[in-house]
Amino acid sequence: MKIIGIIAEYNPFHNGHLYQIEKVKEIYPESIIIVAMSGNFLQRGEPAIVDKWVRAKQALLNGVDVVVEIPIAGCVQPADRFAENGVRILNNMGCEELFFGAEHAEYDFMTYAQLVQNLDSTEFSKKNISYAEAFQEAVAAKIGHNIDSPNDVLGLAYAKANLKFGKKLKLNPISRNVAGYHDKSLSPDSNIASATAIRKVLFSKDHNLVDKYLPSYQDLKDEKYISWDDFWPFLRYKLISSDIDELANIYGMAEGIQYRMKKKALELKVEATFDEWLKAVKSKRFTYTRLTRLSVATLVGMKVNDVSLYNKFPYVHLLGFTKNGQKALNIMKKNSEIPLLAKISQQDKDDFYHVDYRAGKIYQSQNYKEQDLKRAPLIF
């Protein structure tokens, strides 16, 4: 029994994701597939278009055997930390191989990881460019070419994490089929489109265009689609009503950015949108993605201590499984060092799960569905 791991967001689950799962089954027909998935807020600091339960259901109905949630403190992170938290979870769940999409599947990501493992990240802050740009420059100098496509960047991050944890996973990059990560339009000649293009159409309400790109559209068509527009009034209130010292304790705050975030929230016209606020706050050092992650941390009140605690005492939330997946869960219970939460209790929500619970309640304010407390895993 081969246990395969995937780290994903499924925002939403589309035919490109299905293609990846089918490739796994083609290579390992009897495998068990475990997915470590982002929750209601995603790695790049965006709210998921539909909640984690809908996305987990879509995965389980399309070939995945177990879906677990990467807690928000491990998920809303730069690529390296996101990858590290995902790989740590999959290692502890007994996965032997990691499959992931890549723009350049021919790259030897593990060799690249060995070449860049000793980069001095403290030097990056001395340059008048973003951390991501400084990192890209340093990587290119080590390996001889740029790695700047989104999934290649994640592939390198997975390899670095795998190196850190003793190379327990075999890495299997799969070429992205047709659509690029940030492609904004649907191709009429293919049934695969980027999640970016699909979300754009779903938000436009022109849903008849998107059906062929989604294997589980019926699960999506009656959902309310969530975006930053839904949470901007809450974030703006938080920025205006919080004092500077309080904001300074939010995870990711640095270089006094809290002053600028608060100032622009106060100064912009009443009808200003989240995107307009982002443009007003953005600088060379603070990219849009860095600011959206900061925005999530501010919205849910995720502090430096919360992330430190998660790093020391990680946990994972079980969202759903199939009968086949139950076998992998039985193995994990015997061998894992990370607690697996099947149902969130009152004690959990008041203890280590409090940030995830708060994030769920904030998301629930817009989709009106209980996200955590006493909610049982999906079983198929």
Curated annotation (Swiss-Prot):
It comes from the Bacteria. Transmembrane segments: none annotated. One of its GO terms (molecular function) is ATP binding. It catalyses: cytidine(34) in elongator tRNA(Met) + acetate + ATP = N(4)-acetylcytidine(34) in elongator tRNA(Met) + AMP + diphosphate. The keyword Oxidoreductase does not apply. ATP binds at residues 7-20, 101, 151, 176. Pfam families: HIGH_NTase1. Its EC number is 6.3.4.-. GO terms for cellular component: cytoplasm. One of its GO terms (biological process) is tRNA modification. It is found in: Cytoplasm. It is an enzyme of class 6 (ligase). Keywords: ATP-binding, Cytoplasm, Ligase, Nucleotide-binding, RNA-binding, tRNA processing, tRNA-binding. Belongs to the TmcAL family. PANTHER family: TRNA(MET) CYTIDINE ACETATE LIGASE. NCBIfam families: cyt_tran_rel (TIGR00125), PRK13670.1 (NF010191). Catalyzes the formation of N(4)-acetylcytidine (ac(4)C) at the wobble position of elongator tRNA(Met), using acetate and ATP as substrates. First activates an acetate ion to form acetyladenylate (Ac-AMP) and then transfers the acetyl group to tRNA to form ac(4)C34. This is tRNA(Met) cytidine acetate ligase. It comes from Ligilactobacillus salivarius (strain UCC118).
